Design a protein with these regions (language model features):
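Short active-site loop/helix that positions an aromatic residue
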Residues: 14-22, 116-117, 209-219, 421
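C-terminal or mid-to-C-terminal helical accessory/interaction module adjacent to the motor/catalytic core
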Residues: 74, 87, 96, 139-234, ...
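Basic, low-complexity terminal or inter-domain segments flanking catalytic cores
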Residues: 2-5, 28, 93, 121, ...
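C-terminal helical "lid" subdomain and adjoining coupling/linker elements of P-loop NTPases
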Residues: 191-200, 211-266, 310, 458-460
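Intrinsically disordered, low-complexity regulatory segments
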Residues: 1-178, 378, 468, 507
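Conserved short loop/turn motifs at secondary-structure junctions
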Residues: 2-3, 104-107, 196-198, 287-296, ...
Length: 665
């Protein structure tokens, strides 16, 4: 009887698969084995794409005449650092007694690519290959994945998309980086007083750099506009009402106004004060009940954004933490774009909740959900939607592995608690508020106030994080509530005072690592063309698995961005701005979110079988040829000096450090 070989993406995951089998496993160098089963692993990528000089030694030198470089057949090679493990895996894959191969690499595009490259270079033939697709590392889920494993051929479209993504990044990186470095590198190096300067370009990386530079320039060009509002304070409750222009007002359609509730000049606001009378009457009062539903569950981008706000940690650090929590069976698969449950999981979601009932911090809420049966209708709610899931459902707690929590760092347990509370909150009712809107008339002018008064905490009772300091929130006083409850249309009121309050417009906020991750995920919304925006509205820049790494590369490797580690605020460096100028003048479309998102849309279409790999490759090749030839034709390196000089005025002595350390207001 032949053996089954299980191949995982990393040793820790392989151990979890091995532990699932009721077998005595012997440990060998690079694998484990029993009478029926062999378990081995990769170290992430074991195989990579070969550099151009492997095709032709002449390509080692960067010369414009060798571009564009688009090979007919791509070459691959085993990473030198992984050669020993690759040889072990190759030997196991081709062992005569191995009949079945279970592919247990990460359940996603990149995990598929990792195995397909190993398979390709190992020359696997005449073996039954099955794909294990799981959503968590719990024993039950691993066993289900093995039981329901499908022929690897069912994932061929995903494999095609994975290969194309790698070819796209490879070809754009090599061709555009070389072309722009040859054209502009010497001029840039001279300007910066450096020996060399490489213009590093990437499909996603360059677009993200452009977004940060664009935002920084918007902030620089922003001119604050002062405006003046008129505030009246009601007696005796101290309720503040703000004047707004209404039909019948002396200032209706007046050019003196800044929007509908302020003035451009202080003297005009003070003139209004002289028109107002302390005695007023209620013009309108409305009292409505408003509900606020629990937010959708976490996907990776949303969790990374919240962790930046809550803990001031980078998206990369967040991903490392939740990957560890996943491998310790505490959370489901982390690299997901979905924010909902699958209907299959929703049917048995009480199992997760029962597990959490043993967690002291949230046992009260979990037990309440179980006792009241609040989980029973979740399958019919907006929190369950199979149509909004591609590879994996949202990140949720498994309810298992709780014993591992005691040995985890506090930051990890805080992130875990964040996911747990978001998960439990969806089973609770909405929070309820009483919304009161008040319009008071004084000498024909209208002053307004609105309030949201909490009436039922609902799901917010679950969101009481143990790691946050309890702060007394300022709310409306009971005296004010009593006054508002007593008022009706026509009721007389009295103002104790009026004042002019100065304000000013504020510039756009700099991106933090967290807000950039969300901006990358929602890149389709940045597109101005309505038709194109509708076509790719669900596409982002990069993927949930790659976004954090791209930001890290821009900061730590290329030094195109600066990161304030305390606030996680991103700002461009002088080099980053110069590269952006260089790209804008040569291959401007690389800075476009619409182009970058449309490439990602194309990859999704390939993975779904809606576009062939050949069609995609043809479009990619045409794009590279056109733009490389465009760079060849433009002799604009010296012209760029005036842009570099202008950029440098914002990076004088000590100025770059100052900009880097700026915190958000």
């Amino acid at each position: 009887m032949g053996k089954s070989l299980f191949i995982a993406e990393k040793p820790s995951v392989a151990r979890q698969f091995a532990d699932c089998f009721s077998e005595t496993m012997k440990k060998y160098d690079g694998y484990q084995e029993s009478e029926r089963i062999v378990v081995t692993w990769c170290f992430g990528h074991l195989v990579t794409m070969s550099y151009p000089e492997v095709y032709d030694e002449e390509l080692k030198r960067w010369r414009m005449e060798t571009l564009p470089f688009i090979p007919d057949d791509f070459k691959y090679e085993v990473l030198q650092s992984a050669k020993k493990q690759f040889d072990i895996v190759k030997g196991l894959l081709n062992r005569p007694d191995v009949e079945k191969i279970y592919v247990c690499t990460d359940s996603g595009r990149e995990g598929e690519y990792i195995y397909r490259l190993v398979r390709q270079e190992a020359g696997v033939k005449d073996k039954k290959e099955l794909r294990v697709w799981i959503n968590s590392q719990t024993d039950d889920e691993i066993k289900r994945g093995i039981r329901e494993a499908k022929p690897i051929s069912e994932y061929d479209n995903l494999s095609d998309a994975a290969y194309l993504r790698a070819k796209e990044d490879y070809l754009m990186g090599i061709n555009f980086s070389r072309a722009l470095t040859i054209r502009h590198g010497r001029t840039m190096a001279g300007f910066l007083s450096e020996k060399h300067c490489t213009v590093s370009v990437g499909r996603v990386m360059t677009c993200v750099l452009g977004m940060v530079v664009k935002r920084e320039r918007e902030i620089r060009q922003f001119v604050k506009t002062p405006f003046y509002r008129v505030i009246g304070t009601l007696d005796p409750s101290k309720i503040e009402c703000e004047w707004k222009v209404c039909e019948g007002s002396k200032y209706f359609n007046s050019p003196l106004l800044y929007k509908e509730n302020g003035f451009k000049k202080e003297e005009d606001a003070r003139e209004l004060l002289s028109l107002l009378s302390p005695d007023g009457k209620v013009k309108e009062i409305s009292k409505k009940t408003e509900k606020k539903n629990p937010p959708l569950l976490y996907n990776l981008a949303e969790l990374q954004s919240d962790c930046t706000k809550l803990f001031h940690i980078s998206p990369d650090e967040t991903l490392n933490i939740i990957q560890d929590l996943y491998e310790k069976k505490l959370l489901t698969y982390p690299r997901t774009d979905a924010r909902v449950l699958s209907s299959a999981v929703a049917k048995v979601i009480d199992q997760n909740i029962r597990g959490l009932s043993k967690l002291p911090a949230v046992s009260e809420y979990a037990n309440h959900i179980l006792e009241k049966g609040l989980f029973r209708n979740i399958e019919k709610s907006k929190y369950t939607d199979d149509k909004k899931i591609t590879d994996h459902y949202a990140i949720i707690p498994t309810g298992q592995g709780l014993s591992a929590l005691s040995s985890l760092p506090k930051r990890s347990t805080d992130v875990y608690e964040t996911v747990v509370r978001r998960f439990l909150s969806i089973f609770y009712p909405p929070a309820e508020y009483k919304k009161i809107t008040l319009d008071v008339e004084s000498n024909g002018e209208t002053l307004s106030a609105s309030f949201k008064i909490p009436s039922e905490k609902g799901y917010l009772s679950v969101m009481d994080y143990s790691f946050q300091k309890k702060e007394e929130k300022e709310g409306i006083s009971q005296e004010s509530i009593d006054l508002l409850n007593s008022l009706k249309k026509g009721s007389p009121v009295r103002f104790s005072s009026f004042k002019v309050k100065e304000g000013e417009t504020t510039p756009p906020k700099r991106y933090t690592t967290g807000s950039m991750i969300l901006a990358m995920e929602n890149a389709g919304n940045l597109i101005e063309d309505e038709e194109l925006r509708e076509q790719i509205k669900s596409q982002g820049i990069g993927t949930s698995a790659t976004r954090a790494e791209i930001l890290k590369k821009l900061v730590e490797k290329n030094h195109y961005l600066s990161l304030n580690k305390k606030t996680q605020v991103l700002t461009p460096t002088l080099l980053g701005e110069m590269v952006t100028d260089c790209v804008a003048a040569s291959i401007g479309s690389l800075l476009s979110p619409s182009l970058t998102a449309s490439w990602e849309k194309g990859l999704s279409m390939v993975s779904e079988g809606e576009l062939s790999a050949d069609e995609y490759m043809k479009k990619l090749s045409d794009f590279i040829v056109k733009n490389v030839n465009g760079v060849k034709e433009k002799q604009n390196s010296l012209e760029m000096l005036r842009f570099y000089k202008f950029d440098s005025t914002f990076y004088g002595k000590g100025k770059e450090k100052k900009e880097e350390d700026k915190e958000e207001d």
